[in-house]
Amino acid sequence: MHQIRAIEGDQLLQIALRAAGVDHGRISSWAMEPLTHRVENLTTASLDHVHGVLDDGSTWSVIAKTLQPASASPMFASIPVEHHAQVLEDLRWLNEPDVYRSELGPELPAPLRMPAVHHIEDSGSDRITIWMEDVGDVTPWDEDRYWRTAEALGALGGRWSGGDPRRRFGLRPRDIARLYFGKITHLDLPLQAADEFWDTPEIAAVVDSEHRRDLLQLASDIPRLLAWLDVVPRGLCHGDATPDNFREPAVGDVVALDWSYAH
């Protein structure tokens, strides 16, 4: 369902011009369709593909991501009331626009970058729409791409390891120990302890016989690793580095999306 509120024609034109990479023009036509991407988090109200044609024939295309407080999601009602405050603290819906407004983007180590943000529409109420670059994805997730992405994320982690990047860029701290001893311990690990989970055809088709063993071994090591993290310098991480949050419009151009968990 579209969540984009009315936008002034002049503002849409400015977005279109930035997306097309031109200074002047008029919009001849435009359209908007919901992305087929499934939204599974509480703070994303909608994802829309907005595109059109300028009067000189130039085409433009952007993604409009509309954010909301977690409490505005229909899924919030399924969370026990006693956990509401904690969920709202963990899922801060203003994090992502704050990151895009910060100076982090220009200082990311190459080849990592954010999508270009053309406009952030903030009416001061309970919806914010980020109008951003429609980033293509042309390379397969083969071993080379996993290496490139991992190296880019490693460079990010080491870029500011001697200071406090969270303070520098206005990022809010995130307690990863609480994430592990919360959702992972009480939901993910019990789910993956069942044979039925691993027998699911979609899962069985993509993991080998050692994957389950390795994952459970890693889970048992995490408390020790978390204790070690408490005494070493902290860098900066993306916080949600799943393949779905990365695009490669060209080989080696690593674009990270969804910076709401950066810390």
Regions found by a protein language model. Give the residues of each.
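Short alpha-helix boundary/capping segments
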Residues: L88, R92, W141-R148, H263
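Conserved NTP-binding catalytic cores of kinases and kinase-like/nucleotidyltransferase enzymes
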Residues: M1-S125, P249-V254
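Residues immediately flanking
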Residues: T66, D134, W259
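Active-site acidic catalytic loop and adjacent metal/ATP-binding pocket
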Residues: S46-G57, I63, P223-H263
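Short, solvent-exposed loop/turn segments at secondary-structure junctions
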Residues: P69, D122-G124, G136-V138, T242, ...
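ATP-dependent phospho-/nucleotidyl transfer catalytic cores
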Residues: D134-W147, A155, G162-H238
